[in-house]
Amino acid sequence: IGINTGLLTYAENEAELAAVLSHEIAHLDQHHYLRAQESQQQDQWLYLGTLLASIVLAAHSTDNDAGLALGLSTQAAMIDKQLRYSRLQESEADHIGMQTLVSAGFNAQAMADFFKKMDQQARIVGLMPEFLLTHPLTQDRIADSTLRAQQLHTKGELNSLDYQLARTRLMAILYAKDHNQQLQHYQQQL
């Protein structure tokens, strides 16, 4: 799991950072990457078989479109299967990640809060059609994680002074042009 400065500055509190890490740990714990690779290897033979069939059909048919249609529809079905599988894994990682988040003593609402930020950012950039997404719709993730947080009735930690100090220092280093600007930034954060 990699953590970069973008995540550290985007996560406004320690619980949001913990929510992201809990989600990623769930992927590892559930062997999602290995299972996805195994699924793709199994599907590879089906794909190659139908590709071969489409070539044979195109070669022995007066209508070349039939072979092309078979090849393209197989490819579309394989991509759809991979995307649906990916979305299921993401939902599973959200659920298990929230349990990890709560077990670690953090407020479960932090996961929904982070998804809200992602949703706001996506609206600025532009939304992709749902059928092209590798993750569930962010609005669905917000609704699900908000409901689960309410059901868990957690009042865990959102933040710590150490996290805020580290985050403030990082942002000052990243965005300040000189030491006076850094000092002003620190004073504003207090």
Where do the model's predicted regions map?
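Signal peptide-directed extracytoplasmic domains
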Residues: 1-12, 124, 142, 147
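Short pre-active-site segment immediately N-terminal to the catalytic Zn-binding motif
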Residues: 2-19, 81-88
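Solvent-exposed coil/turn segments that connect beta secondary-structure elements
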Residues: 6-8, 25, 31-34, 120, ...
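Catalytic Zn2+-binding segment of zinc metalloproteases
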Residues: 15, 25-42, 60
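Secretory-pathway/luminal and periplasmic proteins that interact with or process carbohydrate-rich
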Residues: 28, 55-62, 120-127
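Acidic/histidine metal-binding catalytic segments
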Residues: 38-45, 66-69, 105-115
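Membrane-active amphipathic alpha-helices enriched in small hydrophobic residues
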Residues: 45-60, 65, 69-79
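Extracytoplasmic and endomembrane cell-envelope/extracellular-matrix remodeling and assembly machinery
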Residues: 76-190
